[in-house]
Amino acid sequence: MRGCPRTGFPWLSAGAGHNRGVDEARRDRDEEGRARNARPRDGLGRPLPYGTPGVERQPEGVVRSPQETVREAQRLLDAGMPFHAHEVFEDAWKSGPDAERELWRGLAQMAVGLTHAARGNSAGGARLLRRGASAVEAFGGRDPHGIGVGPLAAWARELAGRVEAAGREAAGPGGDGGGVDAAAEAPRLRPGPREDGR
């Protein structure tokens, strides 16, 4: 068998190994026929084995008012479900006005950053928290829809620093440590007390 002239590894035939085609007949599909993984998920969005009870997934493509978006995302963040909150922000990002897309995208990135931090991925979590903070800072001073942009950006940067330091301490340079408690670290999207009194 001839190999690659650069690496010497043997050529693999089409369909070998990970390049094998997907059996479209067995692939999970949604009601519209689009590919969608039907495996249950945990509160941080991680796939669970088929048949395992999971957390109900957020419906995709829901158009909400900004107030509904903030209220639903805050509820999910407070429940320790930042992955699901990111999906709510993503709907607003995709359906909202162009002038606000970066705001919703930044909030989605912060929610995914918290998700990664809770899963123990300190490097990815810190990176996304900072990226989201930078995106929302462009809206500083305006606090669109009552969202406390300045305090949110400060929260994200502070958490990114703690997560990064904990990851280095737990696993050495560039490593990942234990995850944070997503509910305990949930940010306040709007200044003021939580609706649940905590």
What spans do the regions from the language model cover?
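TPR/TPR-like (Sel1-like) alpha-helical repeat modules
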Residues: 122-140
